[in-house]
Design a protein with these regions (language model features):
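Polybasic, low-complexity intrinsically disordered segments
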Residues: 1-3, 7-17
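Class I S-adenosyl-L-methionine-dependent methyltransferase catalytic core
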Residues: 44-348
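N-terminal low-complexity, intrinsically disordered patches enriched in charged
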Residues: 11, 18-22, 101
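Short, positively charged and aromatic/hydrophobic N-terminal segments
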Residues: 16, 25-28, 32, 41, ...
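Low-complexity, intrinsically disordered short peptide segments enriched in small/polar/basic residues
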Residues: 5-8, 29, 46, 66
Length: 348
């Protein structure tokens, strides 16, 4: 089993704080995280590909779906005693504050993990209960103030005794600095490696893995259209290099042709390779609110992301039944109004 997070002491000596910082005596984790420049602090970036910051979106409904699927998949893969290599091609900062400026500016976590935790489901589906327990392990009792990103989720579930490995890639200049610092506090040693490299390209050198077992999470920001074609090209190349790996692709369901074409393309690639696949989507729908009057010159109201999907190639045979039980409960709690729904299909 991976590192067991202690929300009081796990970040003792965080490198972003001075060594004599008072919080180091008994620091709540949420008080010592350093996640880079705040909005308006002058820490801007000159390249468009670096405009996306996941800290604004951490813990939203898309993260809930992604990590629900990720945890359920890892639980199955780690039942075998043989080593596993896990890869996150777009790792982000690793862990996020839900009470920080970025999360509070967007408010997206309120309609995701915060709402789900507050719902207090009497009989949550096993996969949903497992997900909530993983998030809770990084927090004090009550409302979550920290949200573990995929690197923290994966590392927590990997096993030191089995010599599982985790490879993390991130290109954002601020997020990679935060990621290195955050992962160092887990004291995972050689189990985890972090690199400021293009995850799409770097994955090629890792396949096939010496362990002969791999889980690969691919979740770029999709802020540029080429990300969609890069994802499908990455899957096509990866299946040629290592056809038996388990590949998880997250994508946003937005009114863009590339977004709707991506799952169709992934189905085709899986079918051509003769591999099974699973496709899950969650749409929380539009808010049922009275429209607000706009003044002349105001920017049009944008509802934000309301739906996303997870596409899994070579899914565990246990994944579909556990999601079939969990997704309706997710929709029950997180669904907001017109357009809400969930789907689950498989093939191969």
């Amino acid at each position: 089993m991976g590192f067991q997070a202690d929300p009081i002491n796990m970040f003792r000596g965080l490198p972003y704080l001075p060594r004599d910082h008072k919080a180091l005596q008994s620091p709540p984790l949420y008080e010592v995280l350093a996640l880079g420049p705040r909005p308006g602090s002058g820490g801007g970036y000159h390249r468009p590909m670096f405009s996306y910051r996941h800290a604004f979106h951490a813990g939203n409904h898309a993260d809930v779906l992604k990590h629900l699927v990720l945890i359920a998949t890892l639980r199955h893969l780690t039942q075998k005693p043989t080593p596993l290599m896990a890869v996150d091609t777009h790792a982000g900062a690793g862990v996020y504050r839900l009470d920080g400026d970025q999360a509070e500016t967007s408010g997206e976590a309120q309609d995701g993990i915060v709402k789900l935790t507050a719902a207090g489901l009497a009989d949550p589906a096993p996969a949903l209960a497992d997900y909530l327990e993983v998030v809770a392990s990084f927090n004090r009792a009550g409302r979550p103030r920290l949200y573990p990103g995929s690197p923290f989720v994966i590392q927590k579930l990997l096993r030191a005794e089995a010599r599982d490995k985790l490879k993390l890639f991130e290109m954002h200049p601020t997020d990679i600095k935060a990621l290195v610092g955050h992962m160092a506090q887990l004291e995972a040693g050689r189990q985890v490696s972090v690199a400021r490299q293009d995850g799409f390209e770097s994955l090629k050198a890792l396949l096939p893995p010496p362990q002969r077992r791999a889980l690969v999470l691919i979740d770029p920001s999709y802020e540029i259209k080429s990300d969609y074609t890069k994802v499908s090209a990455c899957i096509q190349d990866s299946l040629k290099r290592f056809a038996t790996g388990t590949y998880l692709v997250w994508y946003p369901l937005i009114p863009r042709p590339e977004a709707h074409d991506l799952p169709r393309r992934l189905k085709t690639l899986a079918n051509q390779a003769g591999k099974p696949w699973l496709h899950a989507t969650l749409s929380v729908g539009q808010r049922e609110e009275a429209p607000q009057a706009q003044m002349p010159g105001d920017a049009p109201h944008r509802p934000g992301l309301t739906a996303s999907g997870m596409f899994v190639i070579n899914p565990p045979h246990t994944l579909k039944p556990v999601l079939a039980a969990a997704l309706p409960q997710l929709l029950q709690v997180l669904g907001r109004g017109r357009g809400k729904g969930q789907t689950l299909e498989s093939g191969g």
